[in-house]
């Protein structure tokens, strides 16, 4: 019986995914979208070390190793030599998931019945550098396998002010059914 309930849950799940390079504003967009609309922001597990200013359980759940079976994962990816994943059990109903492109492709292939709204957040390299992203991280991002912009339901170019970003997020919010 649990399996049937689980399948029904997956079929009715609504998920907003957000991808983009380091420093583009993915987490900021996720927070803005979650403020209204009843969406929870999923906290990915990761084996990477915590960065300065990050809070365990907010940006990520920091762990030493991954011991979750793959069939219990919503998505899994490796990036920069570290593992990132989210479990299916973390999703209650409507959720926002900040994920990389490989993870998004795998999610789309694994769960074809999930209602997805895919957002790409991007910013110029100079903007990202001004936000404190290192040149090494920018260079690493250049090695990512990018998805064509047409793959996404919405693209946010985050090169302006916080107020301009709020306006863009509001525009996207109207697109989410």
Language-model features and meaning:
Residues 44-103:
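ATP-dependent small-molecule kinase phosphotransfer cores
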